[in-house]
């Protein structure tokens, strides 16, 4: 599974790339900052024909519920001991990565008189590591949608097992 963010300057190129490689698991995604959205939502068709109708085999855009995933990840960053929910990092990961990973925070804002929590960047610091972590979580959910969860790791282990000598 490969997720490509389509929310930048090359949206149509991303759609074309994902369309041509959809059989290989490449999908176009776009972060949606709304409360209650699933980690990876139902795709919408984004390619239209000359009549303005969605093309049958056109590119699909998968929405990613970034607010919920960020809350989940920030909760998991608080785990100090390995176990369920703990995030593992290579020892070589430097402080710059963790600054990017924690470059946003949740603040309380009022919209139409009602309070809501929104994610905002702490400063002008980059947040690419956080975006990548959110999209990696979305890719995991795509795997859950496509494959039997119980067999994902079995398939992975079989594929990566060294060849056993025949007896």
PLM features: what roles do these ranges have?
Residues 1-112, 159, 163-167:
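Mg2+-dependent endonuclease catalytic cores in nucleic-acid-processing enzymes, primarily RNase H-like
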Residues 114-115, 142-167:
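Acidic two-metal-ion nuclease catalytic site recognized across multiple nuclease folds
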Residues 99-146:
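Extracellular low-complexity, Gly/Ser/Thr-rich intrinsically disordered linkers
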């Amino acid at each position: 599974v490969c997720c490509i963010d389509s929310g930048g300057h090359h949206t149509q190129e991303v759609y074309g790339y994902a369309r041509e490689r959809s059989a290989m698991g490449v999908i176009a995604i776009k972060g949606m900052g709304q409360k209650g959205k699933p980690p990876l939502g139902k795709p919408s068709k984004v390619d239209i024909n000359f009549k303005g109708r969605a093309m049958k085999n056109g590119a699909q855009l998968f929405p990613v519920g970034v607010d919920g995933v960020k809350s989940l990840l920030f909760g998991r960053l608080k785990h100090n001991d390995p176990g369920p929910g703990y995030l593992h990092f290579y020892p070589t990961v430097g402080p710059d990565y963790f600054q990017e990973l924690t470059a946003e925070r949740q603040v309380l804002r009022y919209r139409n008189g009602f309070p809501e929590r929104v994610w905002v960047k702490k400063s002008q610091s980059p947040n690419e590591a956080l975006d990548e972590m959110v999209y990696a979580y979305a890719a995991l959910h795509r795997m859950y949608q496509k494959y039997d969860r119980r067999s994902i790791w079995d398939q992975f282990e079989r594929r990566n097992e060294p060849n056993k000598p025949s007896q």
